[in-house]
Every structure is written in C-alpha cells, then in structure tokens.
Amino acid sequence: MNSWMVDIADTFTRCFIREDRYKLLISGIGVTIKVSIVAVILGILIGFLIALCNLSKNKFLRAIGKIYTDIIRGTPSVTQLMIIYFVIFATVDIEKWIIAAIAFGINSGAYVSEIIRAGILSIDKGQTEAGRSLGLNAYQTMTRIVIPQALKNIF
C-alpha cells in the first residue's frame, strides 16, 4: 500500500477511533435533527400566518406579509442566523440550537408562505363563491372548503 494511504488510514484511526471524535459527529447529528424538526414546525406555522396575511383584504396585513417575505427571501440565511444570534439574542441566555431553529424557522416561513399562498390561490374562485352562497362566512368557507382542497396542492 502507498505510504500516503497508510498515513490517511492512520490519521483517520487516530482522530475518529482512538480519540473518540466519532461521538462528536453522532451528537452533531442529534442537534441537527432537533434544529430541523423545530425549524420545520416553526416555518409551517409562520408560513401559514404570513400566507393568510398576503391573502388578506386588509392592506396593512398584506404590506406586513409582503415586507416579511421580501426581506427574508432576499437575505442569505447565514446572515439572518448571525443577526438573530449576535444582535437579537445577544443578551438572552438560551441554548444555541434553539436560536438556530428559530432563525431557520423564520427563513423557511417566508418560502412556506409562498407555497401555501399558491396552493390556496390554485383553488377555483367558484369554490369560494359556492361556500358563500350556502351561507358560510369567509372563515367557514376558508376552513371547510378552500383549505382542505388546497392542502392537496400544497403537499
């Protein structure tokens, strides 16, 4: 075997096996899974709220949704992570993985809001009109008719 291959194998054995550094990788996978699960849940919640703001008839809510979506989608996620960690949560004693989950949840919320908005807009206006003609109010029409059909398109 070539000497450089022996050196690589020896270095790998020393670093990962004898010095137990594989345990760091395993714990890192656990943190990654925690951050991912929390960020996905938070992103879906934020995305749903922002999608409703973007679809609202209220100009103020639409403006908030548009500003949020434009700013978050227009800045790199690492920049957002650094601002949230070093500026917003600088004086708060909170675990680092929670801050990362919040940052990635906020970031994914902007993208999820557009997916949900597109799913809701993909439902024919006739469905909303049918619900309204049956005597349902706007909330009932959205929750009983539009959103169940939109979920098929969203997922």
Predicted regions and their residues:
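Transmembrane alpha-helices and adjacent helix-loop boundaries
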Residues: 1-155
